């Protein structure tokens, strides 16, 4: 394959992996450990 094609596929896979990890952290089981800054701050 062309090196540009391999580079494009590699970049796309890395981008999808980072997006999947962010969605998993935001909405999956690890989200129970996330704090809400609005609840933590009292005016």
From Swiss-Prot:
Question: Per UniProt, which keywords does this protein have?
Answer: Membrane, Thylakoid, Transmembrane, Transmembrane helix
Q: Which GO terms describe its cellular component?
A: plasma membrane-derived thylakoid membrane
The record, for Pfam families, names: PsbN
Its membrane topology, per UniProt?
Single-pass membrane protein
Family listed? Belongs to the PsbN family.
Q: Where in the cell is it found?
A: Cellular thylakoid membrane
Phenotype upon knockout is:
In a double psbH-psbN deletion has a no more deleterious effect than the single psbH deletion, which suggests it has no role in photosystem II.
The top of its lineage is: Bacteria, Bacillati, Cyanobacteriota, Cyanophyceae, Synechococcales
Q: Name one GO biological process term.
A: photosynthesis
Annotated protein name in UniProt: Protein PsbN
Task: Write out the transmembrane intervals.
Answer: 4-24
């Amino acid at each position: 394959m062309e090196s540009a094609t391999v580079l494009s596929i590699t970049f796309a896979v890395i981008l999808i992996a980072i997006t999947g990890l962010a969605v998993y952290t935001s909405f999956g089981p690890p989200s129970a450990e996330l704090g809400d800054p609005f609840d933590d701050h009292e005016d």
